[in-house]
């Protein structure tokens, strides 16, 4: 067990005085370092060796003054010698060491000075021997104290995940797979963290592997089984003749090591892979994202299919802050000067309960718990500042109230659920290390008696009250799977319909919508006292301090499509019916992934509850990658706009007397009826008579970028003429074959008309072409008048029978603002639609020759029309 910091400081002061006058390297260096390790309560003989033989970089034999494998290399010189040269000499030994034995620190000394090089951070610190007691925290890694600051995309997270991935692949290829492999890896993951963060002794697990298992790996599986059994057995119940290296391990409990596993048959290479994983400094690894990285490396395809997107901590904090942490931090500032109120606040935060119903590897729960513990840390500093300043030693076990057992998760995949469970324990321990640093006493919660509740199951098919009764819950959070309505598997769709099947238009919904609806129904159940709901009734007996808010507060990360286009009316119509109010939201931004092939998805965050919470906070972004700026809103509606709640359903007809809008012509041809410039040239050289059947073709890309493209427009072509154009006929035959092989019955029917586009809506008069998708960077979507001879592709919409005034209204800033507000998006690009954008737009009445109004009204209409036409002409 590590010494308290106060004890270490006392020992350091005595050590400095004892060695203040020593000068000769050879005479007393070994005694010096034995004493140095004793300062931190560690026996040098147990962890490090003197005069370690090694091949230097130049091929010559050398001897390392002191080596603690994988941790520390010491080079010692006589007083006054050059420490830069000592460091250079130390690094010259590196080529002769195994990779897993390479040190994380190099310490050089001349008795009077100690210079520590942190090789992973690149930092260097020099301490005078006489001042060692003032800087003992620099050497906390020796005693087992080590607090890390985690960084997004730290390469250490990637390396650690890849090393575990290598071990996973090697074992799976040998036939050890499935549930047993997943449990084994989670246990190994715990052991790796444990020996680098003070749960186990430093290098205890690695030394066991190196010293108590055969080099060829033949007995490694059996030895691990022995170790796992011991970790699940209290010390007093272990066999007295147990191998001392196993008996020395702490009792862990927590069900982590309870299940018996068939021993894996390791090879030499697999043993080396595990030892290589041991060589990482696991104290640097963030449990918040490691599990996600680990899972993605093991099975990237499965991860994509589940729609999971693992995220940076910065983005997770965008949800956690406005959901609960910002409010708790503000409350802490209000009460921190009042000891009684502060104690009550401490009890309040310890009682808060959280659920992530799509928790994956637990990253949202982990960071929520970490932030709550960080707040508790500040509370304890405020409560016990006088005692700490006076050097009084306090027992953190009596002071820490927050624990992982207030955190719940549901995860459909077994392996991520197991990782989430362990990640919560590891985060708890890492926060306990901060308490150690603050109070000077070791704080390790072993055996594990409390744990997060992570349920392996389908959240859309279960009653969440069976996981945690709504009466006990304060917050729901997470990022359910990002799967669009058209990308769902049959199972995804069945799960969605199990929740939303009664809603008209449920087929339009993205998968994430099911979690919104499920959460809204769940929090409503808390209020159903009149129906005899036990969860709701149970609330009556709770102390008001522990009841939290009357309503559970929820927040999900979601694809931005749930706040745009057709989905809004379907999803939010039901959400509003269930009494939900949005109290904070992040508008569209780029949600980055920490895993391989970093995925960026355009997302929103929506916070909602059944009570009307103020102030309402709306976070907007200048671009999807910029930092947000906050707006205090009077109301946040389902389009994430500061305006009254309104819902637009898809309309078949436009409002007002304006032309109908339609989709362009869909070839459904596999590209056989479309021609590039070069293909057109080649065809006309061979068959010049085909020229009368070739038309200019405009898809959205061609229209926006002025790119020439052509199509075969074979309406009314006589069969005899087609036979005289063999190259054209060959293309038509290819269309027929493609359509005949389609899985869609309607497409197979089109095989009877292979010379024609699959869907034809080409007008006979000039029309307005409207690209269906356009970049968000444009202030105006580029519409344009097009001659009827030019074929409009189905990546556009078209408005026939249009005049200049109607074109002017479509290009107006008012119409563009309408599109940006209610239209759908592809990522963050605009999506123009008939049913939502065009047909719901409140077109103004503009008098004209075809609709003359009487008297002054007619004259005013003509003036308006003239102004709009002039503006439209300027655009053209």
Each model region followed by its residue ranges:
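A short, conserved, highly charged catalytic patch centered on acidic carboxylates
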Residues: 1-105, 119-122, 755, 762
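Preference for the N-terminal adenyl/adenosyl cofactor-binding alpha/beta module
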Residues: 2-16, 129, 133-371, 406, ...
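Glycine- and acidic
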Residues: 13-21, 75-77, 149-152, 168-175, ...
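Signature of N6-adenine DNA methyltransferases within the class I
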Residues: 22, 56-62, 83, 87-89, ...
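Short, hydrophobic/amphipathic alpha-helical patches that form generic packing surfaces
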Residues: 34-38, 186-195, 292-296, 422-429, ...
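Flexible phosphate/Mg2+-sensing switch loops adjacent to catalytic phosphate-binding sites
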Residues: 47-50, 204-208, 331-350, 372-405, ...
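Polybasic, glycine- and aromatic-enriched phosphate-binding surface used to engage nucleic acids
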Residues: 78, 95, 614, 622-874
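Intrinsic disorder/low-complexity segments
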Residues: 525-551, 847-869
């Amino acid at each position: 067990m590590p010494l308290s910091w106060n004890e270490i400081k006392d020992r350091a002061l005595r050590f400095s005085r004892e060695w203040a006058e020593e000068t000769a390297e050879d005479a007393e260096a070994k005694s010096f370092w034995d004493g140095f390790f004793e300062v931190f309560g560690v026996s040098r003989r147990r962890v490090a060796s003197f005069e370690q033989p090694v091949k230097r970089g130049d091929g010559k034999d050398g001897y390392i003054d002191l080596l603690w494998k994988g941790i520390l290399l010491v080079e010692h010189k006589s007083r006054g010698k050059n420490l830069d040269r000592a460091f250079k000499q130390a690094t010259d030994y590196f080529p002769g060491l195994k990779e897993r034995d390479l040190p994380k620190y190099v310490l050089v000394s001349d008795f009077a000075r100690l210079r520590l090089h942190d090789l992973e951070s690149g930092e260097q610190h020099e301490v005078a021997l006489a001042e060692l007691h003032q800087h003992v925290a620099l050497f906390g890694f020796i005693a087992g104290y080590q607090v890390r600051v985690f960084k997004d995309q730290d390469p250490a997270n990637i390396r650690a995940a890849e090393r575990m991935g290598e071990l996973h692949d090697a074992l799976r290829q040998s036939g050890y797979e499935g549930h047993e492999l997943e449990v084994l890896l989670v246990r190994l993951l715990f052991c790796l963290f444990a020996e680098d963060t003070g749960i186990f002794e430093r290098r205890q697990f690695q030394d066991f592997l190196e010293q108590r298992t055969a080099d060829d790996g033949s007995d490694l599986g059996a030895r691990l089984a022995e170790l796992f059994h011991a970790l699940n057995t209290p010390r007093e119940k272990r066999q007295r003749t147990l191998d001392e290296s196993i008996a020395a391990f702490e009792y862990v409990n927590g069900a982590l090591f309870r299940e018996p596993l068939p021993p894996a048959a390791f090879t030499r290479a697999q043993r080396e892979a595990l030892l290589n994983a041991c060589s990482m400094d696991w104290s640097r690894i963030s449990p918040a994202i490691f599990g996600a990285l680990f899972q993605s490396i093991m099975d990237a395809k499965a991860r994509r299919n589940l729609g999971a997107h693992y995220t940076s901590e910065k983005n997770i904090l965008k949800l956690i802050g406005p959901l609960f942490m910002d409010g708790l931090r503000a409350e802490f500032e209000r009460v921190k000067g009042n000891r009684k109120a502060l104690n009550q606040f401490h009890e309040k935060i310890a009682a808060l309960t959280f659920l992530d119903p799509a928790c994956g590897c637990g990253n949202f729960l982990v960071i929520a718990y970490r932030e709550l513990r960080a707040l508790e840390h500040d509370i304890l500093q405020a409560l016990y500042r006088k005692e700490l300043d006076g050097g009084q030693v306090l027992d953190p076990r009596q002071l820490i109230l927050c624990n992982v057992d207030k955190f719940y998760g549901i995860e459909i995949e077994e392996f991520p659920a197991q990782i989430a469970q362990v990640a919560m324990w590891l985060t708890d321990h890492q926060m306990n290390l901060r308490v150690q640093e603050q109070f000077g006493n070791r704080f390790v919660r072993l055996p594990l008696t409390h744990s997060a509740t992570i349920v392996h199951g389908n959240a859309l098919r279960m009653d969440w009250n069976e996981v945690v009764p709504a009466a006990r819950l304060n917050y729901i959070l997470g990022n359910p799977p990002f799967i669009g309505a058209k990308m769902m598997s049959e199972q995804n769709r069945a799960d969605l319909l199990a929740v939303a099947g009664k809603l008209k238009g449920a087929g339009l919904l993205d998968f994430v919508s099911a979690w919104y609806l499920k959460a809204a129904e769940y929090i409503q159940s808390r209020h159903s006292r009149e129906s005899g709901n036990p969860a709701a009734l149970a609330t009556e007996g709770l102390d008001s301090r522990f009841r939290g808010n009357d309503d559970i507060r929820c927040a999900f990360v979601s694809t931005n499509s749930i706040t745009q286009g057709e989905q809004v009316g379907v999803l939010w119509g039901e959400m509003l019916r269930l009494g939900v109010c949005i109290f904070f939201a992040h508008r569209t931004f780029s949600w980055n992934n920490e895993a391989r092939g970093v995925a960026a998805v355009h997302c929103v965050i929506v916070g909602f509850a059944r009570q009307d919470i103020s102030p309402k906070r709306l976070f907007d972004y200048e671009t999807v990658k910029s930092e947000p700026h906050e707006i205090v809103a009077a109301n946040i509606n389902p389009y994430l706009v500061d305006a009254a709640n309104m819902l637009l359903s898809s309309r078949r007809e436009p409002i007002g007397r304006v032309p109908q809008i339609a989709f362009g012509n869909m070839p459904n041809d596999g590209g056989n009826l479309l021609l590039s410039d070069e293909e057109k040239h080649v065809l006309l050289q061979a068959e010049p008579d085909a020229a009368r059947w070739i038309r200019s073709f405009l898809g959205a890309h061609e229209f926006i970028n002025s790119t020439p493209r052509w199509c075969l427009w074979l309406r009314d072509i006589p069969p005899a003429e087609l036979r005289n154009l063999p190259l054209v006929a060959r293309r038509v035959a290819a269309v027929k074959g493609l359509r005949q092989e389609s899985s869609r019955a309607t497409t197979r029917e089109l095989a009877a008309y292979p010379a024609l586009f699959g869907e034809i809506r080409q007008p006979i008069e000039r029309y307005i072409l409207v690209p269906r998708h356009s970049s968000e960077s444009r202030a105006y979507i580029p519409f344009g008048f097009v001659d009827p001879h030019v074929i409009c592709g189905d990546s556009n919409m078209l408005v026939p029978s249009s005049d200049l005034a109607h074109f002017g209204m479509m290009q107006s800033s008012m119409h563009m603002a309408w599109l940006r507000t209610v239209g759908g998006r592809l990522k963050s690009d605009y999506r123009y639609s008939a049913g939502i954008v065009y047909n719901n737009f409140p077109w103004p009445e503009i008098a004209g020759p075809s609709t003359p109004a009487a008297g002054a009204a007619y004259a005013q209409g003509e003036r308006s029309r003239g102004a709009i036409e002039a503006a439209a002409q300027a655009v053209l």
